[in-house]
Every structure is written in C-alpha cells, then in structure tokens.
C-alpha cells in the first residue's frame, strides 16, 4: 500500500465483506446503495461500526487521527 488512505480503502472492502453490504446498511439504518458508494468508510459510520465491537476505530480508518 502506498499510503494510509489506500489502506482505508482496503479496510472498507474487508469490513463490507465481513458484514455484507445489505446487512451493514441495515445495522447503520442507511440504504444499501449508500454503502456501495463509499470509497472509504465515512468518519461517523466508522464510529458506529467500531461500536459493534469487532473492529477498532483506528483499524477502520487508519488515515484519520482520533
């Protein structure tokens, strides 16, 4: 990976694959197409996904400082 943003792109793919796009959208109470449009997981959604307990915030978005 060339930088942390590229890593965040890969982490988005990993997390969506683990939860499933449709299931993740239901857990976040948003539409499935909204999840599909993400290049990386938005900061607010990263907080919500971290609250599920499987991934830490820093893992989900390594390109941001929290």
Which sequence ranges carry the predicted segments?
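Short alpha-helical "recognition helix" segments of helix-turn-helix
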Residues: 23-25, 35, 49
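Exposed boundary/loop context
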Residues: 13-14, 29, 46
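Short active-site-proximal "capping" loops at secondary-structure junctions
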Residues: 41, 64-66
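Helix-turn-helix DNA-binding elements, focusing on the entry/boundary residues of the two helices
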Residues: 21, 32, 46
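A short, Lys/Arg-rich alpha-helix, primarily the initiator
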Residues: 1-23, 55-64
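DNA major-groove recognition helix of helix-turn-helix/homeodomain DNA-binding modules
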Residues: 43-60
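Recognition helix of helix-turn-helix/homeodomain-like DNA-binding domains
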Residues: 28-42
């Amino acid at each position: 990976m060339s930088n942390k943003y590229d890593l965040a792109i890969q982490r988005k793919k990993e997390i969506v694959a683990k939860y499933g796009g449709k299931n993740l959208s239901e857990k976040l109470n948003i539409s499935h197409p909204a999840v599909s449009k993400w290049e990386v997981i938005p900061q607010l959604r990263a907080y919500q996904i971290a609250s599920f307990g499987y991934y830490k915030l820093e893992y989900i978005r390594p390109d941001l400082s929290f």
